[in-house]
Amino acid sequence: VIDYELPRAATLAAVPRWNNLDEAIAHWAATKPTESAYVEPAGRMSWVAYDQYISLLAAHITELGLERGAHVAIWIPDGCVVHVAMSACIRAGVVFTGIGARSGEREVRHLLARGEATTLITVPQIGRVDTVELFERLRADLPALRRYVDVYDVVPVPHGRVDAALDPATGAPVGAAAVASANQLIAGRRTPTDELALLNSTSGTTGLPKCVAHDERRWLKYHDYAVDAGALTTDEVCMSVVPAPFGFGLWTAH
């Protein structure tokens, strides 16, 4: 039997409720710009850097010619970058399927096919797998799969403290003008909270994962449940031990 004191209404009322994730990100980027949005072993990313990288990657996706509602897949090891990628897809108005970093070729192929992905957003190497070589093999059997995106071309792994988006080629801050240009390019593309935003890959009963369709409201509702059940405040620092971007890692980590 678990006995705990129910959180007081005043405590719950003090925790913001958001209409979408972008509202939360923009709020913390404005009010806590240098505080950490995400922390990983290699480094930490501030709220401002997180917000800027999301816009830059969303603009990059848009520049590739993907229409709103296009389907993509995210195959990126857990860490700051995968969270940027998920938010960037929503900001760019494309539907993403999350693929676990430990997935083998058969599972990746299955999820790309089931998710009808036209684009694979990934990193050059996952474990011992050269993702470019794998992409070339997969596209031979998946005619819809046409684009390979190296996320590190836009969003590098943070080393130490990152307080602003950096140019991966030079290591220098990209600057406000580049971010403003990215925001202008993606204006009006954001996926509405009540429309399909992602396909969550999770364990199936046939030896291959299944895909569960979600809109953005699933995060907002889960946030409310977590705040209410745990009497959480805005001072909490949350540790996720469930890998993203799939399964319960989507519920707890992002």
Functional labels for PLM-detected ranges:
Residues I25-A26, T62, C80-I99, R109, ...:
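Hydrophobic alpha-helical segments in the ANL/AMP-binding
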